[in-house]
Swiss-Prot record:
Propeptide: 22-48
A GO molecular function held by the record: sodium channel regulator activity
Alphabetized PROSITE patterns for the sequence: HWTX_1
Name of the featured protein: Mu-theraphotoxin-Hhn2l
Source organism per UniProt: Cyriopagopus hainanus (Chinese bird spider)
Domain-level remarks: The presence of a 'disulfide through disulfide knot' structurally defines this protein as a knottin.
GO cellular component: extracellular region; host cell presynaptic membrane
Expression sites (tissue/organ): Expressed by the venom gland.
Modified residues (Leucine amide): 81
Length: 83
């Protein structure tokens, strides 16, 4: 029952993406779609001086963007959740 509901939802999402892709004429469609879904501007790291999600960093330095934090364990920028 859960699997069939998941497949139905996944099918609707796929239908939405295909419909949106057929209307979109831009070449940056996947990046545009993901940035609209997550409302995060992670894909334009070249335009800013801070490091975005997944970029390597040094703990203790303020290299990551304001909404990210450097992980002491993995040494890359993660989304800061305020914990």
């Amino acid at each position: 029952m859960k699997a069939s509901m998941f497949l139905a939802l996944a099918g609707l999402v796929l239908l939405f993406v295909v419909g949106y892709a057929s209307e979109s004429e831009e070449k940056e469609f996947p990046i545009e779609l993901l940035s609209k879904i997550f409302a995060v501007d992670v894909f334009k790291g070249e335009e800013r001086g801070c490091k975005g999600f997944g970029d390597s960093c040094t703990p203790g330095k303020n290299e990551c963007c304001p909404d990210h934090a450097c992980s002491n364990k993995h040494k890359w920028c993660k989304v800061y959740l305020g914990k």
